[in-house]
Amino acid sequence: EQDINQMGGVWKKLPYTWVLMIIGTLALTGFPLLSGFYSKDAIIEYAYLRGNTAGYYAVVVGIFTALLTSIYSWRLIFKTFHGDYNNNKLKIDTMHESPLVMLIPLIVLAIGAVFAGYFFKELFIGHSSSNNFWIDSIKFLSPLSLDHPPLWIIYFTPVIVVLSIPFSHYL
């Protein structure tokens, strides 16, 4: 079935897929300490540190898109895995977990989502790192400030993402 409105309550039949989807959703929405947190927040923080109109515009757009991403991702989890099963064509009893050939790639991706952000953050962000492998891939018109962004910039997006979870449940 491709209509998520006809799904629901399948987490008991697909427990591994459910856990892997939760991990992927947490990473995609930028949950702290997962891979999406480091990349998304680094972009927003660096945009703020530009200190100009384009940078502030990028911050607003980045935070807004993080909010939308969180809402649609958690809506997918709630509609697909929780709630009532509404499909009259396919009986829930016939549903089963995916074979290992499909689960193994998902497990590898979930491991990367959990650990890659932490282990490779210095490579991508460059804090106290002498390895500037990615430095030429990011072009700036002028050097960034060495200041740190204010705390509200650091904490605002994760707070918005967490607050969007109950909101997306009711969509």
Regions found by a protein language model. Name each.
Residues 33-34, 66:
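Extracellular glycan-interaction patches encoded by glycine-rich segments
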Residues 27, 65-68:
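Residue-level hotspots within pore-lining transmembrane alpha-helices
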Residues 40-41, 70-74, 78:
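Alpha-helical transmembrane segments of polytopic integral membrane proteins
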Residues 26, 84-87:
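Acidic glycine-/aspartate-rich tracts in secreted/extracellular proteins
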Residues 1-4:
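Alpha-helical multi-pass transmembrane bundles of energy-transducing inner-membrane proteins
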Residues 6-19, 38-65, 87-171:
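Membrane-interface segments at transmembrane helix junctions and kinks
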